Swiss-Prot record:
Organism placement in taxonomy: Eukaryota, Metazoa, Chordata, Craniata, Vertebrata
Prosequence residues removed at maturation: 16-25
Compartment annotation: Secreted, Extracellular space
UniProt keyword list: Calcium, Digestion, Disulfide bond, Hydrolase, Metal-binding, Protease, Secreted, Serine protease, Signal, Zymogen
Organism: Gallus gallus
Protein name: Trypsin I-P1
Molecular function, one GO term: metal ion binding
Length: 248
């Protein structure tokens, strides 16, 4: 589930960003409208490996499991295989993982990237607001990314993919992943399967009612029945985000 690669290992589901051999997209979604997600960024290291969200002109929010010490951030991207004229590529000056990030449990799977210069904001590159409160179950959210579009096999569209999916209740989430869901995680998607984020979507945005409520984190497979995507619960980190940005 989500914008990452997921591998079941010793009973634990672990999320990985994609490698240069493995790109990814959303399963069961649709091609986004050209400026549907101007906050969406592509994290690059010679290839797209994760997504992220522009939250100010100089800061991007992503998943801690996407960490690299140096990252090229591509903003205004839509078709990865074409130059649309709207792209901005800015290198990172700082990459800051949450100090409580646990690579085994994926608790606190959140990371800030400071850009080496401010992005130029326009209709194709813009920020997404942080949450003013936590999202409620049943709310429909927009997930986007360049991840795998197949739940079995690989098909990698170049155009940004979108998916509308509901927030599940905490009880539904915990029942799907017994003993694995912390208070810093939310489940979003369909228990019947068929629609989900997937490998390569990791770190990307979940926007609900115009606010950034989730970060693609982990799951078992992609779009598998009974296993919705698991996302970092951004509303728990607003203070950490603001404090980290102001002190760096």
């Amino acid at each position: 589930m989500k914008f990452l690669v997921l591998v079941a290992f010793v009973g634990v589901t672990v999320a990985f960003p994609i490698s240069d051999e493995d790109d990814d997209k959303i399963v069961g979604g649709y091609s986004c409208a050209r400026s549907a997600a101007p906050y969406q960024v592509s994290l690059n290291s010679g290839y797209h490996f994760c997504g992220g969200s522009l939250i100010s002109s100089q800061w991007v929010l992503s998943a801690a499991h996407c960490y690299k010490s140096s990252i090229q951030v591509k903003l205004g991207e839509y078709n990865l295989a074409a130059q649309d004229g709207s792209e901005q590529t800015i290198s990172s000056s700082k990459v800051i993982r949450h100090s409580g990030y646990n690579a085994n449990t994926l608790n606190n799977d959140i990371m800030l990237i400071k850009l080496s210069k401010a992005a130029t904001l326009n209709s194709y590159v813009n920020t997404v607001p942080l949450p003013t409160s936590c999202v409620t179950a049943g709310t429909t959210c927009l997930i986007s990314g360049w991840g795998n579009t197949l739940s079995s096999g690989s098909l990698y569209p170049d155009v940004l993919q979108c998916l509308n999916a509901p927030v599940l209740s905490s009880s539904q989430c915990s029942s799907a992943y017994p003993g694995r869901i912390t208070s810093n995680m939310i489940c979003i998607g369909y228990l019947n399967g068929g629609k989900d984020s997937c490998q390569g979507d990791s770190g990307g945005p979940v926007v609900c009612n115009g606010q950034l409520q989730g970060i693609v984190s982990w799951g078992i497979g992609c779009a598998q029945k009974g296993y919705p995507g698991v996302y970092t619960k951004v509303c728990n980190y607003v203070s950490w985000i603001k404090t980290t940005m102001s002190s760096n």
